[in-house]
Swiss-Prot record:
This is RNA-directed RNA polymerase 2a. It holds the Pfam family RdRP_2. Residues 806-817 have a biased composition (Basic and acidic residues). Belongs to the ssRNA positive-strand viruses RNA-directed RNA polymerase family. Coiled coil: none annotated. Keywords: Nucleotide-binding, Nucleotidyltransferase, RNA-directed RNA polymerase, Transferase, Viral RNA replication. Residues 774-834 are annotated as: Disordered. SUPFAM superfamilies: DNA/RNA polymerases (SSF56672). It catalyses: RNA(n) + a ribonucleoside 5'-triphosphate = RNA(n+1) + diphosphate. The keyword Transcription regulation does not apply. It comes from Peanut stunt virus (strain J).
C-alpha cells in the first residue's frame, strides 16, 4: 500500500501501488498464511488451547514457538454438528455466563453463539489490519456475544501529522452524495459488519413528524368520584382524563371564491341532471318490491340455519315518510322481514370466499405485525405515548348516555355474559347505487352484527383509548381521517402530478379469517392493550352465533368481521393497513390515507408492489382501480391554487341523497327534515373554496371514475349552493302528506267566523258568493264601522270533517243580519232569526 509522502504526491504516484509494494504485500501474506496449514485453522490467542482443550484436534500439530498466535481447528460446521449438551458446554466455557437465581445472564442462544464464533475467526485472521490489539480468543467471542468492546488496549491517539510545510490540504467535497457508513459505538465496526448490535433498531426514528408532535398533552384532571367504579376497574386503568391541544402555528387561510349560478337552478334543472347522469334511476320505483319479495318463493343453501316459525313476519308496516320531488333512484326503507333477512345473510355473511392457500398463521401474523410497525409508526413516539385514557373515556361515555337512563348499575358482568352471542339486523337504509343496473338488479341491504348496549359500553372506552394512541404515533405521511385531530384536509400537499393507488377490497367483512384475527391481536398487543384482554376479545370472535330475534333467523359464524361491535372501524382500518404494508413498500409513497376498507396512496414515482398477494395470501378480492383517482370515503380530493388539498363529496351521491325516501313525515313537526338539512349543509362546507381551477379538477376526476360526462357538475354545484342557503328553500324538495291532511283538517274546527263586506242601505247590492269569507280560530272582531259580523257555532252533535264546513256555512247564512257582535262568539246554540 502506497504511503503518503511529498515526493509521491508531486510525482502523481500517491494512491498507486508500486511493484515493490506489491511484492512486499505478497510476501507478508505468504508468511502469514504459512502459520495456517489448512483452511480449517485460524490463528488465535495462545491461551485458548489451555482454557478450552475440547476445541483441539489430535491430528493437528501445535504451532511453533516463534508464531505469536496459536491455531484453533474447529469450524462453524463443528458447532452445528454438536449436540445440545456439547454446545451448552462450549457456551459455558467461552461466554462464562452468570446465574441470578434461575436466570442465566446472558441467555443461551445457539445461533448467536455460532455467529459470534464465526465473527471472531474472521477478526483474528485480519488482526494485523487493526491499529489496536484484539482480545484473546475466548474473551473475543464473549465480547462479541455480549456486545462489549473487542479490543484489549485503550484507543491510541494518532500523533502522525499530515501537514507539509508550504502546502495546505483541504478535504475534498464529494459531489456524488457519498455518505460515511454508520459505525457501531461499541466496537467501531461498520454497521453491516457489526454482529453485536442492530443499528437499524437503535437508529432514531424522528425522520418523520407525527400527530404527537403537533398535539401536546394539555392537562390531566381527575374525573372519577365513584368508589364502586374504581373498585371494578383493573390496575392498568388510571382515574384521570387527558386533554390534547394543538400547538402548531395557525396559518392564515385564503379562500378564492367565485359566484355560483344559483339563480338559474330549479327542481326541473336538477331532475334533468339526474336524467342525464343516472338514466336507469329515473324510472326506478320500488314501491311494491317488498311485496314481491314476501309473496315469492324462496330457497336457500345455507347450512346450519335455524328458523323460528312462530316469529315469521309476513308483512310489516313501512310507516309514513316524506316524498321527494326529485326521482334519483333512492330506495325505500327496508323492513327486516324473514325473507329480507335471509337474502341479506346470504350475500353479506354466507358464501365466504376461499381464495388463499395454506400459510403458516403464526409466522405470517408476527411478520405482518412487525412490518406494520416499521411502516407506519414512529417508534419513539410509540414508546413515549404509553398513556391510555380508558377511565376518562369511560366516564365521558357514561355521561353521554346518562340522559337515556344508563347508569353504572345497569352494566352487566362480562364474565357472566355469553359474549359469543351476537344480535343481528338489516340496515333500513340502502347505500345509493351509482352503477346503471337498477333496471335489472335490486340492491341487497347490509347487515349489522352487534353486542348488547351494556357489553359495547364496556369495551368501547378501551378501544377508543387504543385508537387515540394509535393516531398519535402515526408517521406524518399516514392519515386516518377520523376524530378531532385528523381529517382529509391536508395543507401544503397537492394531489396533482402524482401517481395514485386506489385499492378496492370487495366482500371485506366476510372474507376475513383466522390470519386477520391473529394480525389484529399482534397489533393490539403492540399498542399496549393488555394481553389477556386482547386474547379474550379474539377468542369469542373465533366462533360466534348470530340471531335476528324479530325475523326468527339464527346461524353460526366464525372469524368474519362483526359489523356492529366496538372494534369494527378500528379493526377494519388495522387490517387494511397491515395488508397494504405487506403488499407494497410504504417508503415509496408521499402520503397514505386509510379509513375502514378504503385506501389511497400517492407517489412521485411509478408504484411497484404485489397486488396479487391480497388474493393469494389474504383471501381478499382486490381490484386495482384503473384509472386511479384521488377518491376515498365517497369524496374527491382537490387541490386549490395555494397548494392545499380539501375533500369534496361525490356530486352524484349527493344528488341521490336529495331524493331520499327515508325521512320520517312528522306533519307540522319539521325536526326530522331540519336534521337532514343541517347534515346537508355540513357536508357542503367546501363550497366557498370551489373555483374554476378546482371545478376543472372535479370534472376531470368525475369523468375518470364514472366514465360519464362531467358537464353536469356545474349544475349540481349550483343546486347544492341554492338548497343549502336556508331551510325554507330546502323544504321545496319534499312533500308531506301528513302536513296536507293537517291543513285540510284545520278547517273543521268548532269555531268559525263569517265576515261580510259592508253593504250600503241606500243601494241594493247584489250579493254573491265572494262576499262571504271563512276564517278558523279568529279571536278578535274587526272594529271598522260598516262591517257586520255574525258569530255562529256549530252544534256539538254535528259530524266533523269536510261535511261539517258545509253545514256550518248553511247555519251561518240563517243567522240574523241585524245582530252585530263586537266580541268572540259565546258557546251555545246559534241565535235564531226573529
Amino acid at each position: 500500500m502506497a504511503t503518503f509522502s511529498l515526493e509521491s504526491l508531486l510525482s502523481g504516484a500517491y494512491g498507486v501501488d508500486t511493484p515493490e509494494e506489491v511484492a512486499f504485500i505478497r510476501e507478508r501474506d505468504r508468511v502469514f498464511a504459512s502459520g495456517v496449514d489448512t483452511a480449517e485453522s485460524v490463528p488465535c490467542s495462545p491461551d485458548v488451547s489451555e482454557s478450552d482443550p475440547c476445541f483441539e484436534h489430535d491430528d493437528i500439530p501445535s504451532t511453533s514457538a516463534t508464531c505469536p498466535l496459536e491455531r484453533v481447528s474447529f469450524l462453524v460446521e463443528d458447532l452445528n454438528a454438536m449436540s445440545d449438551v456439547e454446545i451448552k458446554t462450549v457456551f459455558e466455557n467461552l461466554i462464562r455466563p452468570t446465574y441470578v437465581g434461575c436466570i442465566e445472564v446472558p441467555e443461551f442462544c445457539r445461533n448467536k453463539l455460532t455467529l459470534s464464533v464465526s465473527v471472531a475467526r474472521n477478526l483474528i485472521s485480519t488482526a494485523s489490519r487493526y491499529p489496536r490489539k484484539l482480545k484473546a480468543y475466548s474473551d473475543l467471542v464473549a465480547s462479541i456475544y455480549n456486545g462489549a468492546d473487542i479490543f484489549d488496549d485503550a484507543p491510541v491517539d494518532e500523533t502522525v501529522s499530515d501537514e507539509v510545510p508550504g502546502y495546505i490540504f483541504l478535504p475534498v467535497e464529494r459531489p456524488d452524495g457519498y455518505e460515511r457508513p454508520p459505525l457501531c459505538s461499541d466496537c467501531g465496526l461498520i454497521g453491516y459488519q457489526c454482529a453485536c448490535h442492530d443499528l437499524a433498531g437503535r437508529r432514531a426514528a424522528f425522520a418523520e413528524m407525527t400527530i404527537s408532535h403537533t398535539y401536546e398533552l394539555e392537562s390531566l384532571s381527575g374525573v372519577i368520584d365513584d368508589a364502586t367504579l374504581l373498585a371494578n376497574l383493573g390496575s392498568f386503568l388510571l382515574p384521570i382524563h387527558c386533554e390534547y391541544s394543538r400547538v402548531d402555528p395557525s396559518l392564515s387561510s385564503f379562500h378564492l371564491t367565485q359566484p355560483h349560478p344559483t339563480d338559474r337552478v330549479s327542481v326541473e334543472s336538477l331532475q334533468a341532471v339526474c336524467d342525464t347522469s343516472l338514466p336507469t334511476h329515473v324510472c326506478y320505483d320500488d314501491t311494491y318490491h317488498q311485496v314481491f319479495v314476501e309473496n315469492s318463493d324462496f330457497t336457500t343453501d345455507i347450512d346450519h340455519l335455524t328458523l323460528k316459525q312462530s316469529d315469521l313476519i309476513p308483512k310489516a308496516d313501512g310507516g309514513n315518510y316524506l316524498k321527494p320531488v326529485l326521482t334519483t333512484g333512492s330506495g325505500s326503507k327496508r323492513l327486516g322481514t324473514t325473507k329480507e333477512v335471509l337474502t341479506a345473510i346470504k350475500k353479506r355473511n354466507a358464501d365466504v370466499p376461499e381464495l388463499s392457500g395454506s400459510v403458516d398463521l403464526t409466522r405470517i401474523s408476527k411478520a405482518v405485525a412487525r412490518r406494520f410497525k416499521e411502516s407506519y409508526f414512529n417508534t419513539n413516539a410509540l414508546a413515549q405515548s404509553n398513556f391510555l385514557n380508558v377511565v376518562g373515556n369511560f366516564h365521558a361515555y357514561m355521561q353521554k348516555w346518562a340522559a337515556s337512563g344508563l347508569t353504572y348499575d345497569d352494566l352487566p358482568d362480562l364474565h357472566a355474559e355469553n359474549l359469543q352471542l351476537y344480535e343481528h339486523m338489516v340496515k333500513s337504509d340502502v347505500k345509493p347505487v351509482v352503477a346503471d343496473t337498477l333496471n335489472v338488479d335490486r340492491p341487497v341491504p347490509a347487515t349489522i352484527t352487534f353486542h348488547a348496549k351494556g357489553i359495547t359500553s364496556q369495551f368501547s372506552p378501551l378501544f377508543i383509548s387504543l385508537f387515540e394512541r394509535f393516531q398519535r404515533c402515526l408517521r406524518g405521511r399516514v392519515v386516518v381521517p377520523v376524530g378531532k385531530i385528523s381529517s382529509l384536509e391536508m395543507d401544503n400537499f397537492s394531489v396533482l402530478n402524482k401517481h395514485c393507488l386506489e385499492i378496492d377490497l370487495s366482500k371485506f367483512d366476510k372474507s376475513q379469517g383466522e390470519l386477520h384475527l391473529m394480525i389484529q391481536e399482534e397489533i393490539l398487543n403492540l399498542l399496549g392493550c393488555p394481553v389477556d384482554i386482547s386474547k379474550w376479545w379474539c377468542d369469542f370472535h373465533r366462533y360466534s352465533y348470530i340471531k335476528d330475534k324479530r325475523a326468527g333467523v339464527s346461524m353460526p359464524i366464525s372469524f368474519q368481521r362483526r359489523t356492529g361491535d366496538a372494534f369494527t372501524y378500528f379493526g377494519n382500518t388495522l387490517v387494511t393497513m397491515a395488508l397494504f404494508s405487506w403488499c407494497y413498500d410504504t417508503d415509496q409513497f408521499d402520503r397514505m390515507l386509510f379509513s375502514g376498507d378504503d385506501s389511497l396512496a400517492f407517489s412521485l414515482n411509478p408504484i411497484e408492489g404485489k397486488s396479487d398477494w391480497f388474493t393469494s395470501l389474504f383471501n381478499m378480492e382486490a381490484k386495482n382501480m384503473d384509472p386511479p383517482t384521488p377518491y376515498i370515503c365517497s369524496k374527491f380530493l382537490l387541490t386549490d391554487e395555494l397548494g392545499n388539498t380539501f375533500s369534496v363529496p361525490d356530486p352524484l351521491r349527493e344528488l341521490q341523497r336529495l331524493g331520499t325516501k327515508k325521512i320520517p313525515d312528522g306533519g307540522l313537526d319539521e325536526s326530522y327534515l331540519k336534521a337532514h338539512f343541517m347534515s346537508f349543509v355540513d357536508r357542503l362546507k367546501f363550497l366557498p373554496r370551489m373555483t374554476h381551477h378546482t371545478v376543472a379538477q372535479l370534472i376531470t376526476f368525475y369523468e375518470m371514475k364514472y366514465k360519464k360526462s362531467g358537464a353536469e357538475c356545474h349544475a349540481s354545484l349550483g343546486g347544492f349552493a341554492k338548497y343549502s342557503t336556508n331551510f325554507s328553500i330546502y323544504k321545496e324538495l319534499y312533500i308531506s302528506d301528513q302536513k296536507r291532511l293537517s291543513l285540510i283538517n284545520s278547517y273543521s274546527d268548532d269555531n268559525f267566523e263569517v265576515e261580510r263586506k259592508p253593504i250600503l242601505k241606500s243601494k241594493k247590492v247584489k250579493r254573491n258568493r265572494k262576499d262571504v269569507e271563512c276564517r278558523a280560530n279568529s279571536y278578535e272582531a274587526p272594529k271598522t264601522s260598516g262591517k257586520a259580523e255574525v258569530s255562529a257555532q256549530t252544534s256539538p252533535t254535528k259530524q266533523e270533517g269536510p261535511w261539517a264546513q258545509k253545514s256550518e256555512r248553511v247555519e251561518a247564512s240563517r243567522t240574523s243580519r241585524d245582530s252585530v257582535s263586537l266580541f268572540p262568539a259565546s258557546t251555545g246554540p246559534p241565535p235564531r232569526r226573529r
